[in-house]
Amino acid sequence: MDLDKLITEGRNPDTLDIDRLSTEDMLKKINNEDKKVPIAVEKEIPNIAKAVDIIAEKLKQGGRLIYIGAGTSGRLGILDASECPPTFGVDPEMVQGIIAGGDVAIRRSVEDAEDKEDLGKEDLKKKNLSSKDVVVGIAASGRTPYVLGALRYAKEVGAHTVGISCNPDSEMKKIVDIMIAPVVGPEVIMGSTRMKAGTAQKLVLNMLSTGAMIKLGKVYSNLMVDVKATNEKLINRAKRIVKLATDADEKVIEKILKETNYNVKLTILMILTGLNQNKAKELLDRSNGYIAKALMLNENKS
């Protein structure tokens, strides 16, 4: 596919004079273009929903969510994956990010790494990919060889595949099971897909991981009840979450949090039901980790 035929590589007619504008006017142009991004993502919600349902289903079966991309796309996948353990209390293996060129490419551009299909395949092979996993290929253009190679290999293995691109009719679309293609239009600076395309990709990734984790019971109301309290900030957050969920006395909250080794979910259930730790844990296990379901079971029992 020729670059000049890609929407993401087009020249934006609204920013032709951006090099001659005042600082404020220049920034207004950028901001006006950024406003188009959430609208483009909104149009893709039906496809994002399909992906979330598949991801949640596979994670429940013990599978993994693996993001793979090059450059900005790869970094965004790693960013999203790295936030899942502290936010949702999951094993770091559950959601992973892979970038063309390896870890050094997270901090420094390794431009030629994206040009080899075999490298994408090899990087996924190292992960012992299986049919229980979901591979999300991220490429603004939808044509990055490294990502396409990875997706083709994922299909061979029987893993479910999702593509994220900002070009609607890309090579990627022909490969994946679910295509997510928010069309954000040409960039403010021609071809600089770290801008609108990158923002769109980040919004989609937010939805994929957050949506899947909600469906796994990692959220109660809108509270992150599986947060790992590994530092002072997160310990304070854990206390606040329990307070918001239960409205209990702060001394009671602190006491039970310490008893449960700062297990927020268990603490909430113990306070709301009056059960001891063993009984609350048993109830939570029967509810597959869903607080709302556990409360319903307890209510029906009484």
Curated annotation (Swiss-Prot):
Its EC number is 4.2.1.126. Gene3D superfamilies: 1.10.8.1080, Glucose-6-phosphate isomerase like protein, domain 1. CDD domains: SIS_Etherase. The keyword Lyase applies. GO terms for molecular function: carbohydrate derivative binding; carbon-oxygen lyase activity; ether hydrolase activity. Keywords: Carbohydrate metabolism, Lyase. Residues 55-218 form the SIS domain. It catalyses: N-acetyl-D-muramate 6-phosphate + H2O = N-acetyl-D-glucosamine 6-phosphate + (R)-lactate. Pathway: Amino-sugar metabolism; N-acetylmuramate degradation. Coiled coil: none annotated. The active site is at E83 (proton donor), E114. GO terms for biological process: amino sugar catabolic process; N-acetylmuramic acid catabolic process; peptidoglycan turnover. Homodimer. A lyase-type mechanism (elimination/hydration) is suggested for the cleavage of the lactyl ether bond of MurNAc 6-phosphate, with the formation of an alpha,beta-unsaturated aldehyde intermediate with (E)-stereochemistry, followed by the syn addition of water to give product. HAMAP family: MurQ. Belongs to the GCKR-like family. MurNAc-6-P etherase subfamily. Specifically catalyzes the cleavage of the D-lactyl ether substituent of MurNAc 6-phosphate, producing GlcNAc 6-phosphate and D-lactate. This is N-acetylmuramic acid 6-phosphate etherase.
